[in-house]
Amino acid sequence: MCTLIVLHRCIPGRPLVVAANRDEFLARPAEGPAIREGRSGRILAPRDLAAGGTWLGLNDRGVFVGLTNLRPAIQDDVDPDGPVVAKPGLRSRGEVVMAALDAGSAVEAAEALGELEIGAYNAFQLLVADEREARLTVYRERPEIITLPPGVHVVGNVDDRNDRDRCPGQDLGQKKATGEPRVRKLSRVRERVEKIRLQADRDLFEGLAGICREHVGGVGTQAVGSSSAATHFESTCVHAGEAYGTRSSLLLELAEDRERSRLWGTDGPPCERPYEDLSPLLWALDVRSGPAAEAEHETRTKR
């Protein structure tokens, strides 16, 4: 997955809202969202059929997990307009998501992620959140856990440490190539989401869907900007030739009133495919949270 937008505890009545675009090689096989059996309960997640596991999911305790692949550190020999290519021989990052979905809370998931084996995976960022807490794991050879405050968080394929939402008061990443298209995308998307969340008269899902469809440089039906430096990967909806691009998009809203929770998804790029209402899957998952759910999870894990 390449663009992950999370609004955590900043929308009244909706403690967790997610928008996510998955960019991947078009030939890589996958299944769409479905309810599946995890090791400690049920989960709602798509499935990667090439390596197993998944790139995002929600469990029946209300823990959301989403992973984005990280590019190598900016170097002269790294193509800023190319896809993220994994080193062979390392363990699948999809199994990290599946393991995190076994947790009873975001805090529990983050504690387990902090114990990940050193050097076992290609680089990634993984965000876990429930209705109370959110954590970001940045993994480059070893895990680093960041506590996220309430607000808007946008995660992509670069470790954007200038994100004041994620690292308040820290001025990191100044040596990063600010012209990198993925860095520009994170800044643009963050600004757009902040504006949309303040528009009380607009449906939040419709606004997020519009962002997920966007192309930069005047290409496509939802085009923004006209920079000559725009590239495929500055767009939220990516079309990088015949082999790589946005494969699917997902919108998730967990409301305090569970009957008002929503799930929309596309099978294909959202600029070409309409969002389908997948909310019945979310209702069938029957998300539970709070002390009762934690007690049930503890009972399950002791069996």
Language model regions located:
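N-terminal nucleophile
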Residues: 1-303
